[in-house]
Regions:
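Active-site/pore-lining binding-face segments in mid-to-C-terminal subdomains
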Residues: 256, 260-309
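Active-site-proximal beta-strand elements of phosphoester/diester hydrolases
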Residues: 43-56, 171-180, 214, 275-280, ...
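A short C-terminal boundary segment appended to hydrolase-like catalytic domains
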Residues: 40, 296-358
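His/acidic metal-ligating clusters that form di-metal
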Residues: 77-87, 172-174, 186-275, 331-332, ...
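Extended active-site neighborhood of metal-dependent phosphoesterases/phosphodiesterases
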Residues: 100-200, 270-276, 287-291
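N-terminal secretory signal peptides and thylakoid transit peptides that target proteins
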Residues: 1-22
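N-terminal active-site segment of His-dependent metallophosphoesterases
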Residues: 30-103
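Active-site environment of divalent metal-dependent phosphoester hydrolases
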Residues: 55-58, 96-100, 123-131, 181-184, ...
């Protein structure tokens, strides 16, 4: 690594921390309450890694497979330099397509984290239903085997794909799984009736605590293409309205939900008292991870770039612009105007650092 690479990366990190610190000073108290009977806690810092899509035999395209292992390794090293991280949440699509060998590779890196890390599965974390999508030289795991492989990182010996954890008194984590591993065509999602009832029960029983909700798929849409019937509708839940209804009913206890899957820059929407975040992908442009600080009163964030070379980041941006499917329908053809519109959605640079009340 040359001095220019190092100084640029350190400048971005230091600048991001300075802005985040300002946001925290403005919006966070030392202890705050959700209600007079709520459990107080000091602000908590945590990180989110999403859509690493690690592939030990891949080539760079829209998904930067050839450097995917390096992206995880560098991100782990950078997160280990963050101060006072309570945990790291990995919000699905750890693998390219359910390969055991890729699972071993990413776990090797994640196990180097000094903060505890928790995992939930995405639609690429189990064996493809269609044998044509299975590559020679790899062995494949079912979603049940994925859960067992990452047992102890959120998953328990029960084998259930969803779970809750107590982070500290007053703060809990709820991980949901809407994947459809036996669906032969769609890569979308739906939360089972059992899981929806469980979620409602969890939030009812912990109404005086703050519950952070995580899921790979999205509760809300981020572009017109994701509406029902659109070419990207499966980025969201089939029964998103049912899930949002439960969260809205418990908005005081579950004011924040964070998803991955969409591969765009960090963004949020507030719906009926709940703030829904989308976390950026580690493996495709803009190749970022996220660090949050939360209290009962507010949430602040930064989304640093993965610490790979400038040439890697430029290649990732060019590969995104070449990937026609990933472009919005109205900007499908490349032009200066259309390319700028595509990058605006995927980079969302105005949200690299920010904060909001919850």
């Amino acid at each position: 690594m040359n001095a220019m690479d190092f100084s640029r990366r350190e400048f971005l990190k230091l600048g991001g921390m300075s802005l985040l610190g300002t946001a925290i000073n403005l919006n966070f108290g030392t202890k705050v309450f959700a209600s007079p009977t709520g459990t107080p806690f000091d602000p908590v810092r945590f990180a989110v890694i999403s859509d690493a899509h690690i592939d030990i035999k891949g080539k760079n395209a829209m998904k930067m497979s050839a450097i995917s292992s390096k992206c995880v390794e560098r991100t782990v090293a950078d997160l280990n330099r963050e101060k006072e991280l309570a945990f790291v949440m990995v919000t699905g699509d750890l693998l390219l397509d359910g390969e055991v060998e890729n699972a071993k590779e990413i776990k090797k890196h994640l196990d180097q984290l000094t903060a505890p890390y928790y995992v939930l599965s995405g639609n690429h974390d189990y064996v493809p239903v269609d044998p044509k999508n299975r590559r020679e030289g790899f062995t494949y795991m079912t979603i049940e085997e994925f859960v067992k492989f990452f047992s102890g990182h959120g998953y328990s010996d029960s084998g259930k794909r969803y779970y809750s954890l107590q982070i500290k008194p007053g703060l809990r984590l709820i991980a949901l799984d809407a994947c459809l591993p036996l669906e032969p065509v769609k890569w979308g999602a739906a939360l089972s009736e059992e899981q929806l009832k469980w979620l409602d029960h969890q939030l009812t029983g912990h109404a005086n605590e703050l519950n952070l909700i995580f899921m790979h798929h999205n509760f809300v849409s981020w572009s017109a293409d994701e509406q029902a019937g659109g070419p990207k509708q499966w980025f969201g839940l089939d029964n998103a309205a049912d899930a949002r209804s439960i969260l809205s009913k418990h908005a005081n206890a579950a004011p924040v939900a964070i998803s991955g899957h969409r591969h765009i820059g960090l963004n949020y929407k507030e719906v009926d008292g709940v703030t829904y975040f989308i976390a950026p992908a580690l493996n495709s442009h803009p190749m970022r991870y996220s660090v949050f600080t939360i209290s009962h009163q507010a949430i602040a964030w930064k989304t640093p770039m993965v610490s790979v070379s400038e040439s890697n980041h430029v290649e990732a941006r060019e590969n995104l612009l070449k990937a026609k499917w990933w472009r919005a329908t109205q900007y499908e053809e490349s032009s200066s105007f259309n390319d700028a519109a595509v990058l605006e959605l995927y980079e969302n640079n105005g949200m690299i650092v920010g904060s909001k009340k919850i």
